[in-house]
C-alpha cells in the first residue's frame, strides 16, 4: 500500500517475519540519501558507520562516518569509555525549517533508547562527548524526560540548557535546518565565526564532509 504524506510516500510492506520485510526492502528499495547527494552510492556501507548493528534509520549519523575500527580501538586503549545510544533517524531530518518563526516548525518525532547504565556513566563522567546531533538528541531527551526509551519531539534551539553533553563532534550542516539550530544552542552566536573559517579554509560540508569538535563551555 502506498499513500502520500506531504512530500513523501508511506509504503507498507507485509511479510511473515521481520526478515521477510528486510529482504523486500533490500530487493526493491534504495538507501535514502540527503537531497544534495545526486549520485547513487555503489556500496551502501559508504553511508554507514562501522558500529551500526541493525537497519532502522532513514539516514546515517554522519558524524560517526569519521570513525574506523582502529580509531575506536585506539580511543578505548587511551582510557576513553565508549557508550552507545539508539536514535532512529527519520526522513524529516533532511527537511528545512520553512516557518517564519523557527519555534513554529513542526518537529518530527524519532524513536530513541538510552540505557540506565549509559545515563549513570554520563553523570559520573568528567565530560561527555557526543558523536553527532542524533546522539545528543537521544541523551538530552532521556535526561530531560526521564524516559529511557520512547519517541522524542525535542527541538533543541537557542536558549536550551544542556543537561548531559559537554562536547559535540558534528559535521557542517545546511542553513535553515534544526541541526544548525542545535549547533547555535550549543555554542551560541560564535557558530558563525566557526563556519566562516571553515568556508575560508575550504572545509568540506555536509554528510561526507569534515567535522568539528565543539565545546559549549568555552
Which residues does each predicted region cover?
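Surface-exposed, charge/polar-rich loops and edge strands
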Residues: 1-218
